[in-house]
């Protein structure tokens, strides 16, 4: 796992530049898709593409507890390697309103079972976690945050 203070886009290689370009193109598509929405999340969407990225590799029994990304506006995940779910949501990403200090068992949860190559965007303020998995394989992702100009690292 890349330490969070090391931004993979800070001194990019040619491959990282290609990856960043893919993300930026997907962000453009995302913005166009929702541009007519009246919610403040879209209306105040950052116009500058300040991306902060890192990698995560989880092994068997790997998971991430529910968390948010407080300095980001939008967070994203690119799935480089996924794990088979075995019908139990293993390796899925779960979105909810539940976090360390915000637990409500009745709050809605949304599970997404990723496939290799998927890119997933979500508000950085939305709690998310990785469902633990039992298969003897790795789950490898590139995570990133779109940082508003005032919050740039």
Explain the meaning of each model-derived region.
Residues 32-35, 83-88:
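Proline-centered turn/helix-capping motifs that create local helix->coil transitions or kinks
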